[in-house]
Amino acid sequence: MTRKPRRRQGAREVNNKFCVLLCLYIWFKSVIPDGRDLNRMFPGSKTGSLASQVAFKLMSKIVPQVDLIIDYHTGGADRFNAPQIRIVKDEPVLDELANTFGAPFVLYSKNINKSFRNACYKIGVPILLFEGGKSFSFDKTVTNTGVNGAKRILHYLEMLNSKFKVSKPKKQPVYVSNSKWIRAKYSGMFKTTVSINTFIKKGDIIGNITDPFGKFNHFVKAEYSGYVFSVNDAPIVYKGDAIMHVSIELED
């Protein structure tokens, strides 16, 4: 069970602090120089590999001291993600925090074994996983969503200085309880024809796959109706590659 973050009582509270960790930025990826993915090494080991020791330090020195964690991620492997918060189902505390953050989508997903999110969940520390944009790419909308969401959370916890304005979300988040990837049926050059965040209907043409010589042109049709919240931006795809993530079940 996730514990509820403590609200601070006024600006006189000494421990009104938030911590920003950019420990992975120097490597530009979550794979540590020893070749291991840090996000698959939690809770870590004091005497293990470098990645395992980094995970152990986070879990033993920092995480036990905090009331709430917001973990910011971008899409990998040329995938562009719509701004979204990922949490587990049936956790009212996380639902309230995700709604306060105000990202366009809230995706219910299971915790992955040995991930940072799973390790925090096991010890009751609330964590919001933010996904948005893609690696090595700047997107103003995604950045603003992430910043504004953090400000709303700080305001909710009564930790934000009154000189900072807090904007309301333009609309309520769409809660996604189940989703599926549409996969490429052929290899070739892929170009999408739909925008992220849009609602598509089963049978809609959402892109096409061609060859370099113009002799082959396959129109990709939506296999499900739902919101598009992740798109593969890679110019070349192979048969079976995930090209578009679509919601198939929504929560009221």
Can you describe what each PLM-predicted range is?
Residues 1-252:
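Structured catalytic-domain cores with a bias toward divalent-metal coordination
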